[in-house]
Amino acid sequence: MLNFRALFLLILFLAVPLLADRSQSEQMVNRAWEAWDRGDKGEVLPLFEKAIAADSTNTRALLGLSLWYELHEQYKPAWGLFRRFLHQEKNPYPYLFATWTTPKMAVPDKKEMGVFPVWMDLVDHPDPTGTLQAMAFQELGDFYQRRGMLDSSRYYYEQTRALEDWTVCGPFDNISASGFERIFPPEGKYDFQKTYPGQSGVPAKWHKISAIRSDGWIDFRRYYAYDNAVYFGNTFVYSPRKQRAEIRVGTSGSLKVFLNDELILEYFDENNNDLDTYVVTADLQKGWNRLLIKCGYSEITQCNFMARVTDGQGQALEGIRYSSEPQKYSAKPGAEPRVRPNFAEQYFEEQIRLFPDQLENYVLLAHCYLRNDKAIEGELTLREAIRRAPGNPLLYQNIVEAYSRGEKFDEIATTMERLYDIDENLPFAIRFQYNRLMESEQFDRGEELLNRLREIVPGTAELAAEEIGFYSAKRDVPKIIESTETAYREFPDNWQIAATRAMISIQTTRAYGEAVEIYQKYLEKNYTINALSTLAETYLKASAVDL
């Protein structure tokens, strides 16, 4: 007969050391963050490592050490630790969203670093909202396009299910963003044949666009040459029945969304953001529904949007179809719109409420805000974190991005000085000081900082490009040529370095043959518009020269 008392005691005996290890590990994580704030640079890394050794499943330890490596621009270990974190974290999706555009996920060779499998896992196992899956489709489209595998690229872009059949109209006046509140004729009845008075008297009428960007974004700059303007996109959505649907939009520019002539979403700030940034649940009527997008820009340089119509999980609705052709629809039937907050922002806001002393949540919430250009929200979040830990360099480096997006240049300079005072060996802080010295042509002091970068982050394409820039600033032609040739041998797939090497070849040989070969070699692995256009321009310049 099984002795339940003995079994219970055995389980208790085995569990006590495990609980002790977890408690000890958590204590070391807290000590690591405290040391980070105090400036005990030599203690932070060992404490995180000891915490992981004590409990390899401690997600705070894995995440904290990943952030430490990323701050020091050691992206391979940063990404490796973050992948381990994802495997241990019960709800990894908010963390993936927050980290998506950070340097450790933006490394050039995403297959080697293991980012590629994360995308494929999202393709096969969508996140609850479907937003990360759509982002993975976009990344895979980009990945294959850069390699010239256009059929694969097109396939993954199409899986995003972005609406592609639109008519567009513009430009309309938007001086000092005044067009956001103005009601322009396209906001009324849709009339494809009508011509309206547009910006500066330019006739504005609806046009059916014959081609869009391969990634599914409707880019007004590709159809119009006018800045400081408001533009419209119009399409019709057919639903086999009345049903709730999510209208998901990402933009560069201010935004208003109308469904069946009813305003269901508006955002005044001109932000550069990602797909699904704005999500509103509304009623699609049975039959055809008019969807109108109003975008404006006056402070930024881009104006575009992507729209998706999905269910609550970000998946395609059955029986839905789209057409830019004029359709009969019921105007203002009552959409009952309800804006859905960003899931990752909500998650980290709740984590901060529950654990106000865990600084990583402030950093990740700021990442969520800043990746969608919410500069003020990101700044306020990081200010609170700095109030709690005024000596932590991670917080200062992140708030610089908030200041940059908010164009607060004085705050950037002050914060960078503070960051350099806290840790003069941070690559980010060194580069800021180095660039200031280069602007004032203090080359000797600048070279000292460049040498420090060589010691801290050796063997990177960024450092090689900085060395070329250093000799260019000094107008040291032999060194420019020498450093460029060295850099190109090591980093032929870096566009800045490859283009510089080609330019030097043209200048020194007065011929284009080698430059063409450099561009062609680059394009073998990096099929980009920039490289293609440069190669085409080189062919034109060399048209009278025997290549």
Tell me the role of every PLM-derived stretch.
Residues S23-K50, A54, Q327-L380, E401, ...:
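Alpha-helical segment of the N-proximal tetratricopeptide repeat
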Residues E26, R60, Y93-F97, M135, ...:
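Start-of-helix register in tetratricopeptide repeats
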Residues T101-S214, C295-N361, A366, R371-D373:
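Accessory carbohydrate-binding/adhesion or oligomerization-edge regions at the termini
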Residues L259-M306:
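Beta-strand-rich ligand-recognition modules
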